[in-house]
Swiss-Prot record:
NADP in keyword set: no
Family listed: Belongs to the LRR-containing bacterial E3 ligase family.
Entry GO CC: cell outer membrane; extracellular region
Protein name according to UniProt: Outer membrane protein YopM
InterPro entries per record: Leu-rich_rpt, LRR-bact_E3_ubiq_ligases, LRR_dom_sf, LRR_E3_ligase_N
Summary of the function given for this chain in its UniProt record: Effector proteins function to alter host cell physiology and promote bacterial survival in host tissues.
Length: 409
């Protein structure tokens, strides 16, 4: 099982923000307002000037622009039309969605705009953002820098995943969520002064350290960087999720009591701090552990594979998935009754304890097993190879029998 950390806060990214009635409206100055005819003419000219052979659906785009203007609609959707550019936009617009096109730049954006979603384009730069903007979604572009954001006093959500950013500008105090994974970031701006920030996604960058984190934080995802240490975490009262896998960590700081998910896979850890009682998900695989201390009582997922573990502590009764493959285990403790998946391949096990009746997956290949437990009927995925056999004569006969079975199947 793998938990996608973005599911913790996926409500932020499901759709652009809608009209917010509690915000002060930004009036459009009268001298800048064009007539409907002027907009129609400008859009018709933009349609006629489409590059030949590009397959752009500018006729469809103009139809939607006219409809938006006629109805004074606050939202405009121009997804998947193959557009290489956008014309001037209706002045009353509050939400623009123009994802999955070939845009290399954006026109001047309406001052009333609150939500901008233009992911999966070819944007290399952004001009200044409208003052009322709340949502900025520009993932999967070619951005090398962002405009100044500190004065965007309504901005709540920034998604700049999968770009070429080497640095982020100072962030506004209103920010609640930032996704900046898969860039080239070497550092993050100051975060401690962001009182509403709940989630940071900065995985797959080149971060060497993290700044001090705000008290409001709930999720930090910083896997696949070059972090050698983590900042203080214990005093963050709402922190539930830490993903710091694939880094250079040798130690961890004390953990907050609110923590529910901890992924520190593929580091250089030899031990863990005291684990919070609230922890339900723990991945410490591919480290240098020789053992694990007491496990939290509500843990349902434990991956401790590819370490140097010789013995395990008692397992909590809540555990549903256990992966301890590629260790130095001689025996396993009693298995919890709710366990559904047991992966203990590549160890030194001579026997396996009694198996739970709900077990669905059992991998114990590459162990010198002398005895087999009764396999529950619930098991759907079973791997037990012939290395279990100690007697070479028995091994030879079983191998021959298996080959004959394979021939006649």
């Amino acid at each position: 099982m793998f938990i996608n950390p973005r599911n913790v806060s996926n409500t932020f990214l499901q759709e652009p923000l809608r009209h917010s009635s509690n915000l002060t409206e930004m009036p459009v100055e009268a001298e800048n307002v064009k007539s409907k005819t002027e907009y129609y003419n400008a859009w018709s000219e933009w349609e006629r000037n489409a590059p030949p052979g590009n397959g752009e659906q500018r006729e469809m785009a103009v139809s939607r622009l006219r409809d938006c203007l006629d109805r004074q609609a606050h939202e405009l959707e121009l997804n998947n039309l193959g557009l290489s550019s956008l014309p001037e936009l209706p002045p009353h617009l509050e939400s623009l969605v123009a994802s999955c096109n070939s845009l290399t730049e954006l026109p001047e954006l309406p001052q009333s705009l609150k939500s901008l979603l233009v992911d999966n384009n070819n944007l290399k730069a952004l001009s200044d953002l409208p003052p009322l903007l709340e949502y900025l979604g520009v993932s999967n572009n070619q951005l090398e820098k962002l405009p100044e954001l500190q004065n965007s006093s309504f901005l709540k959500i920034i998604d700049v995943d999968n770009n070429s950013l080497k640095k982020l500008p100072d962030l506004p105090p209103s920010l609640e969520f930032i996704a900046a994974g898969n860039n080239q970031l070497e550092e993050l701006p100051e975060l401690q002064n962001l009182p509403f920030l709940t989630a940071i996604y900065a995985d797959n960058n080149s971060l060497k350290k993290l700044p001090d984190l705000p008290l409001s934080l709930e999720s930090i995802v910083a896997g696949n960087n070059i972090l050698e240490e983590l900042p203080e975490l214990q005093n963050l009262p709402f922190l539930t999720t830490i993903y710091a896998d694939n880094n250079l960590l040798k130690t961890l700081p004390d953990l907050p009591p609110s923590l529910e998910a901890l992924n520190v896979r593929d580091n250089y850890l030899t031990d863990l701090p005291e684990l919070p009682q609230s922890l339900t998900f723990l991945d410490v695989s591919e480290n240098i552990f020789s053992g694990l201390s007491e496990l939290p009582p509500n843990l349902y997922y434990l991956n401790a594979s590819s370490n140097e573990i010789r013995s395990l502590c008692d397992l909590p009764p809540s555990l549903e998935e256990l992966n301890v493959s590629n260790n130095k285990l001689i025996e396993l403790p009693a298995l919890p009754p709710r366990l559904e998946r047991l992966i203990a391949s590549f160890n030194h096990l001579a026997e396996v304890p009694e198996l739970p009746q709900n077990l669905k997956q059992l991998h114990v290949e590459y162990n010198p097993l002398r005895e087999f437990p009764d396999i529950p009927e619930s098991v759907e995925d079973l791997r037990m190879n012939s290395e279990r056999v100690v007697d070479p004569y028995e091994f030879a006969h079983e191998t021959t029998d298996k080959l004959e079975d394979d021939v006649f199947e």
